[in-house]
Regions:
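Bacterial N-terminal signal peptides that target proteins for export
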Residues: 1-8
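N-terminal signal peptide c-region/cleavage motif recognized by signal peptidases
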Residues: 14-18
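Boundary of Sec targeting at the N-terminus
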Residues: 20-22
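Short coil/linker segments at helix-helix boundaries
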Residues: 25-54, 71-102, 112-146, 161-175, ...
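Residue-level recognition of tetratricopeptide repeat
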Residues: 62, 103, 150-151, 187
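Generic helix N-cap/helix-start motif at coil->alpha-helix transitions
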Residues: 117-118, 150-154
Length: 227
């Protein structure tokens, strides 16, 4: 079923090409943005999941490993159309947010889960099939941006979601994208989202929200993989 094939999870990794020494975080973004086909992406996701599991075995309280494990499960659920993985990712994101509500990355991951499902399936189907709610996603999205400390990642990812949710909301999406371009790039992921936000701005400046939304879809994780 179509609803089994979608879950959006926040982009919480840094871009580089795959290598044995890569962290789970790096492997996941490589899968999301560098892989040119689904088998390659899944292989990188599997490697990231194994790496996160190994880190958790060494230290069960490792928040970074817990987050990347949840992201990996969500990505796998999206690509394999596994409702079980999709729901498992949600539970993991919720647990991370409950443990630390001020964790901006966990808030963004949960926001992406809800909003991605709504964008892909529509509000009714997303809620019925997966329990995803636009209101929950927007609340987590706004919290993530507020808690993000001016880092580019958070407004950049928010801008993509906002224009996809409402192609008429050009002003808000543009303001977020501009904030991302001007934001602090303390990690590679911030530079990645500055690039994505810059690409979105080009479309937004044309004043065509629907065109900008189409561009945004291709800028999200796995947005350029063939169907």
């Amino acid at each position: 079923m179509r609803e089994l094939g979608y879950v959006a999870v926040a982009l919480v990794a840094a871009v580089s090409s795959p290598a044995a020494a890569q962290s789970p975080r790096e492997l996941l973004v490589s899968a999301a943005f560098s892989a040119r086909d689904k088998p390659t992406a899944l292989a990188r996701i599997d490697a990231a999941l194994k790496g996160a599991d190994a880190e958790i075995a060494r230290n069960p309280k490792n928040r970074e490993a817990q987050l990347q494990r949840a992201v990996a499960i969500g990505y796998r659920g999206k690509l394999k159309r596994s409702r079980g993985d999709v729901l498992a990712a949600r539970r993991a994101f919720e647990a991370l947010v409950a443990a630390n509500p001020r964790d901006a990355e966990a808030q963004m991951a949960l926001a992406g889960w809800h909003l991605g499902a709504v964008i892909e399936l529509g509000p009714l189907v997303a809620r019925t099939a997966l329990g995803a709610r636009k209101s929950h996603g927007l609340q987590a999205l706004d919290r993530a941006v507020a808690l993000g400390g001016g880092r580019a990642f958070f407004p950049g990812y928010a801008s993509l979601n906002r224009i996809l949710l409402d192609p008429a909301d050009i002003g808000r999406a543009r303001a977020l994208a501009e904030a991302a371009v001007k934001g602090r790039a303390t990690a590679l992921i911030d530079r990645v989202m500055q690039r994505q936000a810059g690409a979105l701005l080009q479309a937004l400046r044309g004043g065509n929200g629907k065109s900008a939304a189409r561009a945004a879809k291709g800028l999200l994780p796995f947005g350029r993989l063939p169907d």
